[in-house]
Amino acid sequence: MTSVRKAFAVVAGAAAVILTPATAHADPGHQVTYTVTTPNTLTATIQYMNSDPPSQAAYNADSSKYMNNVQAPISDGQPVVYTTTLANPNQWAIVTASGILHWPDSGNGPAAFHCEIAVDGQVVAKQDATSAVTCATRPW
């Protein structure tokens, strides 16, 4: 190869590297952990986002495609934990819990709940409430 051809090959190769768009690596998503506890003995209705909707409109049209709805026995502060992967947890991570006390085990009065959302191991939202609780990474 002549020196002109070598120089052209080097310049062409460098231009190809510079002009070729970088391959986008898909975000593998973030591990989202939802935790619900109560000091009471009850069956809780727990809902949590298990997959990212493509848009708010899609979520509004059929939230059951993206939310899990679970009836879970829970008591004595023992955590109920659900884990999923979300691409955009800042937009979509949410967990709600409500329940009815089992009388006489829990006495009278409203149920007390605590919820937390952790993203990649870091707690990003937590809330305490009576009767029903919601933890979310954004206002709903």
Describe the residue ranges of each PLM region.
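Surface-exposed loop/edge segments in extracytoplasmic proteins
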Residues: 56-59, 68, 121-126
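Tryptophan-paired
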Residues: 59-87
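Short, surface-exposed binding/anchoring microloops in extracellular/periplasmic proteins
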Residues: 27-65
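Solvent-exposed loop and beta-edge segments used for protein-protein assembly and interaction
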Residues: 26-28, 40, 76, 87-89, ...
